[in-house]
Structure formats: C-alpha cells, structure tokens
C-alpha cells in the first residue's frame, strides 16, 4: 500500500512501502498531519517493506546454526523460569514461611510475560529487531539477579515480574528472528527445535531446581540464567543481522510510544492483579463475601470493561488489534492456547507439591519423578515439529493432542496417597505426549497466515494467550488448593489450626504436625485433586476450541493470510 493511500476506516495516511514519487517534504507533512489529528500511524501498515525476506537473505550454514542455537538458549532460560520454580517452591515456602503467596511466584512472571507481549511485538516493529531482543534479554537478566538476592517474598515477586517483562521481549523476538531466518516451509522444523529447548528446560528444570534447593540454595535457580543469557547475547550480537523485511518504521518517537498502548498494558496488569488478589484473599485471609474480595472482583469486571472500550477506541494502535483478532487463524489458536497452556502449567506447578508433600520425597527426588513427563515433552517436541513440516497437517494434530492430554490429566486426577509408581509414571507420559505434540502448532498457524509486517504481532498474541492462561490458571488452582484443603482439614484433623497449616511450608508438614499427619495429608490430597480437576477442565475445553481452528494445511499459506 503506497503512502498516499487512505484507510477508509481511519481516514489517515498509511505508512507502507515507500512511493518513490513522494518527496521527503510530503512525508513530513503527512507525519505532522497525523500528529495534529492526535492519532499515530496505523501500525499494521507501518513497515518499510511488507515482503518476507528474499531467498538470498536467509542465513545459511554456520550463521543459521548459531542463530538457532542462540534462540534455543534464550528460550531455554525463559522457559526454565517457568519450570524450575515448581520444584523450588516447597523450599521457598519454608524460607519465607507460608503458602499464601505461592501463586504469585508463578503468576508475577506470567503476568508481565503475557501482558507485555503485544507491546514488545510492536517494539520490534518500531525499533531494531536485534537491539530490542538484546535489551529484552538484559532486562530478563536483571530480574533474575533480583530473584537470586531477594531477602523476602515481595522482593522475589518483584524480580519475577521484571524477569517476565524481559522474557516477553525475548519470546516474541526469538520466534520473530526464527521466522525471518528460515524459509516458510522449513519454519515448523526450526520452531520445533526451539520447542525442544522448551522441552529441555522442562527436563532440566525440576532436576536443576531440586539439586539447587537440596544441595546449594534455591537462589541458584535464578543465578543460572546469567551465564546462559550472556552467551545467547554474544551469539546474536555477532551472527544475526536484521533482514530488509524487518526494518523498523520511520515515525516520530511520540507516535511509536503511542502505538505501544501502555495504557492498555496497564489496564491488563491491573486486571490480572485484581483477579489474583481476589483468589488469594478469598476463603483464606478474608471471607468470600468480605468487602475486600467483592471489591476486587467488581474491580476486575470494571477494568475488563474499560480495557475493551479503550482497545476499541484505539483501533489500529491498540494492544489488541481488532482487525487481526477477527481472523479465525488467530483467535481460534489463541483461545486454544490459553486453556491448553493453563492446564499444563497447573500440572507443572503442583506435581512437585504432590511428590514432596504426599510422598515425602526430596526436591531432587521430586525432579526425578517428574522425568516421565518432561522427557516425553522434550523428545516429542522435535518429532512433532518434523511431522508438521513434512505434512503441513496442523489442526488434526491439535485435536488429537488435546484429547490425549485430557485423558492423561484425567488419570492424574485419580492419584491418591500411596499411588504406585507404575501409575504416576505411565499417566505422566500419556499427559506429556498429549501436551507436547500440538504445543507449537498454534504459533505455526498464526505465523503461516500472517503478512511479514504482522509477524511479530501475531507471535506476541500466541504468547499472550499462553502466559495469561498460565497466570489465571495457576492463581485459580492455588485458590482451589488452599480453600479445599482448609475445608477438608476441619474434618480430617480438627485439632490443626488452618492458619498454621497455610503458614507451614509444604516440606515441613510432617515435622510441624507429627500427630495429625494422616489427616493433614488427606487435606493436602483433597486440595491437589481440586487443582487437577481444573487442569482436566481446561484442556478439555481447549480440545473443543480446536474444532474452530481452520483445517487448511500449512504448506502454501505462508506469507499471506490464506484463510480468515
């Protein structure tokens, strides 16, 4: 679209492929006209080039190898921050004395990781792809350092939030770099390789978290990010060069900032905080009908309405662009990913609690018992990526994966005190296989049906859905866990003070309540079953949402919205 064209919906000049007949003065006049109208240039047309990289621009050989390696390292550490904490949480609750803030250890990271996805996606549109990725990595490293030195729970939560902000930029930028570095037909293979880094972090996370928590300190769960992230930064600095299709928009800084939609991001953050706090207080420190809990829930609804109105008002500048969200190739896989990822993260955070509290294993032992799930996840990620690359089949794989995951999580729900090894090994393998085979397919579908200028934005939307699913699901699961446990303890161990139980770390319940341990374990198990039930429901709903995803093969649709 040439610069002199007009968007009929906005009646504003669009910044598209440069028209050589347009003078520099004309360009300046158009920019000034936009500024006087109080609107920034519509972001979806704001590219120097709407084309994917030319064939000779794709890196090859050693350069491609190192670029993919760097993105795998970056993916490894931002994913490790999601998987390593689950095993470390019982030890963290011991040091910071309580279960009341457990949901924040995961949700603070998911909140900023998800909330800033679209803004970071736009940052890659308006600023250098390479520079923005490196700055995001630096922010992530700062957050990890804060987590490592945190003197209390609040400092740890703050560090997690900062790390999530950096992780948002790294995730969007990493997959955008892969998209611009690989030909469309080979893209599923490389995203599968990056997915294997996620799987590797899933394998290493519980083991590393358990080893550090047992033998050194849980703080090393965060220190480990520093050298790995530094290596990834050096590789990107040397080997990656932004292609012509990824040139940033030439627009005034004010317009770039306006298009980041920081108001929308702030509303989303407030929305998530209200939800988490309501679930944290409800039934634990406050009754569900208390003014504080009701106020938070009312605030959640009010902010949600305000966010919808604000996003509609901003139009093309919004964090959530209506033009893109109307496409079935984006909203269907995004919704699928919200529920699918939410279900997985519940298992990721609560299986270690099951093993360490119910089975009385050490953190290392808990990590070892998680291996059936995480090893399956790692191996199957590569196989799934290769299959999709070879066949182009996407939606059927999503449905089959979600169906298998539903069966697997349903079987995990049947676990109880003293469940034999054969069941907790086999059920984890089944669930993991179901979760991994479709994990990256929503990303493949969104990218294969996006124009070059929309690549980073649609990538961000998938990550937004994934991480918000994690934030909401982990918070809901924690609320269900604690409330169910407190209700159950009144009958299984009536002499135990419920508030004392909440204030006791998951690995200390036997030492703290030796005379009532059987009743405490029954209460813990009831709470864990409540979390597993939520996991089953979410992945089951994801399976239904998969039916709405377009059934076209990915081959032949890359680079230009094949279906709407």
From Swiss-Prot:
GO CC terms, sorted: plasma membrane
SUPFAM superfamilies the record matches: MFS general substrate transporter
Membrane topology: Multi-pass membrane protein
Pfam families in UniProt: MFS_1
Region annotated Disordered, chain positions: 1-52
Cellular location(s): Membrane
GO molecular function, one term: transmembrane transporter activity
Keyword annotations from UniProtKB, A to Z: Glycoprotein, Membrane, Transmembrane, Transmembrane helix, Transport
Compositional bias per record (Basic and acidic residues), positions renumbered to this chain: 1-10
Residues listed as glycosylation sites in the UniProt record: 37, 289
Family annotation (PROSITE patterns): MFS
Database matches in CDD domains: MFS_Azr1_MDR_like
Record field: transmembrane: 60-80, 101-118, 131-151, 161-181, 192-212, 220-240, 262-282, 293-313, 329-349, 368-388, 392-412, 425-445, 462-482, 531-551
Entry's family note: Belongs to the major facilitator superfamily.
Role, per record: MFS-type transporter; part of the gene cluster that mediates the biosynthesis of gregatin A, a fungal polyketide featuring an alkylated furanone core.
Protein name per Swiss-Prot or TrEMBL: MFS-type transporter grgE
Organism: Penicillium sp
Lineage of the organism: Eukaryota, Fungi, Dikarya, Ascomycota, Pezizomycotina
């Amino acid at each position: 679209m040439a610069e002199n064209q007009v968007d009929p919906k906005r009646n504003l000049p669009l910044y598209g492929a440069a028209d050589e007949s347009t003078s520099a003065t004309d360009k300046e006049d158009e920019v000034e006209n936009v500024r006087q109208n109080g609107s920034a240039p519509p972001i979806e047309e704001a590219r120097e080039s709407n084309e994917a990289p030319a064939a000779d621009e794709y890196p090859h050989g050693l350069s491609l190898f190192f670029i993919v390696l760097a993105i795998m390292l970056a993916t490894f550490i931002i994913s490790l921050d999601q998987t390593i904490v689950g095993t470390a949480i019982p030890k963290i609750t011991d040091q910071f004395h309580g279960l009341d803030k457990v949901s924040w250890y995961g949700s603070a990271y998911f909140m900023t990781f998800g909330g800033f996805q679209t803004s970071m996606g736009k940052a890659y549109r308006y600023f250098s792809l390479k520079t923005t990725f490196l700055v995001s990595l630096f922010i992530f490293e700062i957050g990890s350092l804060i987590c490592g030195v945190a003197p209390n729970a609040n400092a740890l939560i703050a560090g997690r939030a900062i790390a999530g902000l950096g992780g948002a930029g790294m995730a969007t930028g990493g997959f955008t770099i892969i998209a611009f570095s690989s030909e469309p037909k080979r893209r599923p293979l490389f995203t599968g390789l990056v997915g294997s880094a996620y799987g590797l972090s899933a394998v290493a996370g519980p083991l590393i978290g358990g080893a550090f928590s047992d033998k050194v300190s849980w703080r090393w769960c965060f220190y480990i990010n520093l050298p790995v992230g530094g290596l990834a930064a050096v590789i990107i600095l040397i080997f990656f060069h932004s292609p012509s299709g990824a040139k940033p928009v030439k627009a005034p800084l004010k317009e770039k900032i306006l298009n980041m939609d920081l108001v929308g991001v702030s509303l989303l953050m407030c929305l998530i905080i209200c939800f988490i706090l309501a679930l944290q207080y409800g039934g634990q420190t406050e009754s569900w009908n208390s003014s504080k809990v009701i106020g938070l829930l009312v605030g959640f609804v009010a902010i949600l309405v305000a966010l919808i109105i604000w996003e509609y008002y901003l139009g093309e500048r919004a964090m959530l662009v209506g033009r893109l969200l109307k496409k079935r190739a984006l909203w269907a896989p995004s919704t699928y990913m919200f529920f699918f990822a939410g279900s997985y993260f519940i298992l990721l955070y609560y299986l270690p609690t099951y093993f360490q509290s119910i089975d009385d294993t050490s953190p290392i032992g808990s990590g070892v018992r998680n291996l059936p799930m995480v090893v399956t996840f790692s191996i199957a990620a590569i196989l799934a990526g290769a299959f999709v690359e070879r066949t182009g089949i996407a939606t059927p794989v999503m449905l089959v994966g979600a169906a298998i995951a539903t069966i697997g999580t349903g079987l995990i729900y049947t676990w109880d005190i003293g469940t034999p090894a054969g069941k907790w090994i086999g059920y984890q393998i089944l669930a993991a296989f179901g979760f991994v085979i479709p994990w990256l397919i929503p990303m493949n579908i969104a990218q294969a049906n996006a124009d070059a200028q929309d690549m980073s934005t649609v990538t961000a939307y998938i990550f937004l859905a994934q991480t918000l699913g994690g934030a909401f699901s982990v918070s809901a699961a924690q609320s269900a866990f604690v409330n169910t446990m407190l209700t159950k303890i009144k009958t299984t161990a009536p002499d135990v003070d419920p508030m004392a139980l909440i204030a006791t770390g998951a690995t200390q319940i036997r030492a703290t309540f030796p005379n009532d341990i059987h009743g405490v374990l029954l209460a813990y198990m009831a709470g864990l079953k409540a979390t597993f039930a939520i996991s089953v429901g979410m992945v089951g709903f994801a399976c239904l949402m998969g039916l709405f995803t377009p059934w076209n093969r990915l081959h032949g649709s890359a680079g230009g919205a094949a279906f709407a």
